[in-house]
Amino acid sequence: MKHKDSEHNIILQSVFRATLIAMIVADLAEVIAAGIDGMLTGRYLGANSLAAFGIAKPFYSITGILSAVLSSGAMTVSSHWIGSGDVDKTRQIFSLTCFLGVVLSVTAAGLGIIFINPFTRILGANADLFFEVRRYLLGLLLGVPAIVMGNVLTIFLQLEGKRANVTLSVFATIVVNLGGDAFNIFYLKGDMFGMGLATSASYYAALIILLYSFIKQDSMMRFRFRDIDYAMTGELLSKGMPKATRRICNVFRPMIINHTVIMIGGSIAMSALSVQHSSSDFLELLGTCLADVVVLMCGIYYGERNREEIANTLSMSFRYIMFGVMSVTAFAFLGARLIASFYLGSNIQAIEAAIPCIKLYALKLPFLAFNEIYMGYFQAIGDTRYSHAMSVLHRFVYVCASVVILGSIFGIIGVWAAFPVSEILFTITILILAALHERHLPRKIHDMLFLPASFGINPENRFHRFIRSREDAVSTSKEAYNFCAEKKIIHKRSMLVALCIEELGINAVTYGFSRKNQIAEVSITAERDDLKLRFCDNGRLFDLKQWFELFHSDDLASHIGIRMLFGLANDISYMNTMNTNNVIIKL
């Protein structure tokens, strides 16, 4: 048992770590672009310009709503079609998503430019900051199509397993944005419009790299107008809406906070808040990406009704909070002056105002990570209404109420204190809800799953093994046959399941394993008349084209066990996501 636990930890840790890294890389472009703008603006254009930068920050949340709906919807819908081997429908959703992305993003950019004056006022710009906020927004609005389409194309590149292209696009974003900002400040002696324009240019540079990935011959995705099926639009948008709820809250929350800060503390306080906004993009990154990992991994395990793996995934995310997020918290609290100086240069008054803001903000990071993980978890277990309601409470109601109440009582320090207070209150809310659900105080992770007692698979109906070698593949195949026989599965079906496991295992070991810690996981569940086989390995990713060609090979002896089992299957799914190959066969 100890050996199997060790094997289990290897693949779970490998999947979790690889997925987390992929999420962080994918989010880095926007984070770094905003961070570079904030740092250079504060140091070289002054405190007022930095305040304008902070006021305009909801712009990223607004564009994020559109990006979230399209990218999340495309991921949900197309992943099933890729897994089922339906490349034509996958290309249809790709073409539809790209078409909608271009039309909606260009429309949004045009409306933003036409109505830029009221848009600037809605964001909270007063008379002193109106001109600079307006100029910055104008530069950013020109880049909306590139921002939206970059997010959309990134999703499809991840589905194809081309993470190197995503990394290259992030690198291009950093280089072009930094170079453009420096050119604007030191050569053109420009203003906030130039800063926004440089950011837009960096997104277009990244978009060009992403587009090139789809032009190459090895790409499965091709945009064709004839592939667009407008009837899929409703499904695409509805599947993407849950993720958009948090983005919507991110738009309206800063408006209330900005108004409160300016009213209580003026431009100096707003520049302090802008430093917090700019640094938060980096400091919150680990926590928010942990939440994204939980959405994916717990969503898979929820579909399998695998209570134990759900608990293990949550436990692993909490360990990252203890060692990762707590380290970030210590850095932000102890390095508050360094962070403020990084953004504000030698502006002593602004630096002193920013230090307490950063320190109190740092205290919220562990609670924020915990809360974000549970927001993602509620989405993963399919409780959409609960996820929406809790997101509104967390992202809007608690923090805005805390800012207004504590700010009116304690002044600007009360506003800064509202950030950790609101997160602590929401953490307490989750614990109370867990206690009500379990009818006792939560004492272990299984008390925090918010799942009915009947959820899960009887251990007697589940077969679970690991494969490291060809010998393991053969022995696992025999054990799988015995398991199926015990469950009174007909002989032919039991033989094909065993043969399929042996062929998948030997293929993974022979062609996919090149490192010490690579391993394959096999699970079979047998309930009533349903039989499900899941094969997962963390070896070299399958080539999707070869996967689809497997169904049409002229060599009838090639992969005979796999092909014959596929002929009996009710549903076949394959995905090379989260740095693993996943084959799911339902009989």
Segments and roles (model prediction):
Residues T41-S61, D128-E132, M192-F193, L197, ...:
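Interfacial/gating helices of multi-pass transporter permease domains
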Residues L50-G110, G150-V166, A272-A330, F370-M390:
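Small-residue-rich hydrophobic transmembrane alpha-helices
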